[in-house]
């Protein structure tokens, strides 16, 4: 160790001895006069001293003046020989290189010394109040005096030497830095420094990007695995619906399949497993079941569970004084048509026997009531006035009796004889009035109910009278 370093170490040890005495003795005595516990109060005293030196300028100046007197007393240097400004220069020169000592002003040295002392006091106070040192300072002080003070001096000297090395490096870096001579060089140096910082940020972001890409790749593999499993389950579910398409429980599953995205049914494997014809058959079956369920719901909501008619056809009241039929059944309608034909043929010179024989020669005209049965608007002709109880099941009367079979000639002749008797009884009470409308052959006017309950006019059969031979056309 050379003479210069020994001089610096002696100054650092003197500095450490002064502040160790303050922390170990002075602050401990102040803690004894307080009402709180010694440990808690000692911690308050250390913290208050550190904050006071940093924030209170007068306390700092008082502390520095006290240290100046202590330094002169320990080094045995006369205060007249070592004034206060030389004292500050001596302390600061021990931390910086000699070549920079003369270039630094006294004010700059004072600010450097203030920063050094504040930093040193803060670190020394933190070290003393640790769990390792605090019990030895508060308890058994006489027994632990040499041990505690030795550890505090070692820490103080180590910290001051470390601080001296940091200041040396700063001054050396400043000496190595050449100030730019022109503005262009200054701008280049500034941009170069900024560029280096950007490159450092780019490296950090690149590494972060790599880690995120690795995480994304892992998540993508998991997603593809889950998607393949989901697609396979959907295909199995759809195949199960195809196998159980005749069961009633397949309808909710079909509705569930319709809500799924179509992308799950567009892969090649599914196209191979399910042919196009089979898909069409399944779709038609599903549509048919949906229509059946819809019709069942409508039927359940209608009164008395009767089907709702789509069209209701009636025969309107003929003009003049012609008798009005009270019921629109097959037997009554046949009677009305026969009565009209009888009057017309009687007027034109034909008899009932000729008409019957004429009707037998043409088998396609045997069923008079079969006119326009293929037209949907006349299929439910008996559904009018469903609220009248005597007309609800009028078609069901005596259908099982063989004597009412309308396809036999005997039934036709019996009906004609019955109608002749009824006509004679009615004519006895009321004379027949010649209706000029019958000259052109009476054609019943037909009206139909639409869904809103209004009448719609329609002419579904025409009867032509061409003179001479009798020709009956039913279209």
Curated annotation (Swiss-Prot):
Its main location: host cell. It is a single-pass membrane protein. Residues 295-305 have a biased composition (Polar residues). Keywords: Coiled coil, Glycoprotein, Host membrane, Late protein, Membrane, Transmembrane, Transmembrane helix. Glycans are attached at residues 73, 83, 195, 450, 460. Residues 183-233 form a coiled coil. Induction: Expressed in the late phase of the viral replicative cycle. Residues 295-324 are annotated as: Disordered. The chain crosses the membrane at residues 7-28. It is found in: Host membrane. One of its GO terms (cellular component) is membrane. Signal peptide: none annotated. Belongs to the asfivirus B475L family. This is Uncharacterized protein B475L.
